[in-house]
Swiss-Prot record:
Gene that specifies this protein: yacG
Name of the molecule in the record: DNA gyrase inhibitor YacG
GO MF annotation, one: zinc ion binding
HAMAP family per the UniProt record, alphabetical: DNA_gyrase_inhibitor_YacG
GO biological process, one term: regulation of DNA-templated transcription
Amino acid sequence: MTPLRPTRPCPECGKPSTREAYPFCSPRCKNIDLNRWLSGSYVIAGKPLGEEDENDS
């Protein structure tokens, strides 16, 4: 049977990803990544809250 999507390396450890935890290799790596988002280790760049552009009003 052909896989639904290609196997890619886990972004945390580099092992091949699994279908159950895609794009990660395991629930452990998935939880490590989630913890990094929740703790603020990962951020998406943007304006700080409260700053409005003059054109937004």
